[in-house]
């Protein structure tokens, strides 16, 4: 029979109406001549009552039903008695009087209950992902992912963008993460690479006259995994020709605002704040700052460069930094808690943590005696500190100071419960450095990628201050998480060649990897740029999920394996032979 309603749709307005439901047996309770079945589909759950007095045949079938049996039930909606109303259930005011029950499929006893209140090891959930996805929270995540994707498509379509698919089998051009390689059977010894992003193809689409492009792109990176990374992921990829950076950022603000309004019912204030990369690093120690709370970093290097405290003085003399955080009313921290904070920053390379407590009559600190009153007053004033505050300092190389204090800032905000719930702070971080120096490789590397356009007025700094060349790059940050990153692109062959020269990549090597792009630039490629939003991360933030694996239907584990399909797996020797490959293990 044709399904007439979904379980979660049944309300008091349908009392007396005959319905046909299809779904799973969530739970079964036997009360002798009455059997109750909680029936579930992706809309919700409803209670079905099988009564021996009115329908002994249906009761006999119901007696055989177990959890996760697939059922078709015909019955009449009726009101529950007042004492049996379940206020915690959307359909809690009604139930279905079963007239006919048909078992469409049986089920083995599941390895875990399909229930939100049951704590299940994640590896078990991933092994039986098809069961895990039946849970309402996972159904909600998958639905919201679909809704977000549809809203993005609709918005971009309304603004003149067209969706274009780019190749999945392409050329390996490693400059960053490792590529996933695919051997070619027809071209012995040659390999395709799965795309890390559609970067080159979307630029070629701009050269092709496709002025407004987008794609929900699948991307692949063979890198060491972290909690918020997957070897394969999706991004909302957008590129546009003939526009100014500010114009494009405003368009993206409108798109993100639409998502917040339609998905969360939240009206965002526009325009979003702008903060330069340098300001973000100076104030927060991070290029993805969380602006929902204070605890800003303060540079006191100039105030302590002549202090008697040797650690601070020598750090500044060796071109290091001394920065601190003022913790409001931190005088309540015990010495053990401060020692724990010291151990915490050591995890990020800091050698230690100096501290001062501002008491009513004095400064309590093992290092206070090494500073003059003038130096102490300067530190307190610079940090905006008040009586009762705890001042925490790290003295080290600028990179270590930034990393350790940004992590400490976040740690303290959580410890002190300073992060407001249900608040969303979006900001653009702009004017990134074009390059950063890689000590291991002994050369400069692109901070984003080598196709990012520099501010042309900054190019004169290449000889003496290459790290000060700014990029026309912009990241969108939400609550301390980068959700999108983009830039204006280089569209002229000469500037692109110069960029590779800056990066220490020989021109011949660059042409061997990217010659097709250089050639396209010789045929009138327009000015263009774009952005990519991490779809998985965006859905994770919208749903409040703790793991990115909870917003992907079939994710990989931390070691890039699939517990359900047991991928990756060894393949047949004949397959390897056809590909002209041999394995060493």
Swiss-Prot record:
Residues 199-202 are annotated as: Aspartate. ATP binds at residues 221-223, 230, 482, 534-537. GO terms for molecular function: aspartate-tRNA ligase activity; aspartate-tRNA(Asn) ligase activity; ATP binding; catalytic activity, acting on a protein; nucleic acid binding; transferase activity. Its EC number is 6.1.1.23. Gene3D superfamilies: Bira Bifunctional Protein, Domain 2, GAD-like domain, Nucleic acid-binding proteins. Homodimer. Belongs to the class-II aminoacyl-tRNA synthetase family. Type 1 subfamily. Aspartyl-tRNA synthetase with relaxed tRNA specificity since it is able to aspartylate not only its cognate tRNA(Asp) but also tRNA(Asn). Reaction proceeds in two steps: L-aspartate is first activated by ATP to form Asp-AMP and then transferred to the acceptor end of tRNA(Asp/Asn). This is Aspartate--tRNA(Asp/Asn) ligase. It comes from Natranaerobius thermophilus (strain ATCC BAA-1301 / DSM 18059 / JW/NM-WN-LF). The gene is aspS.
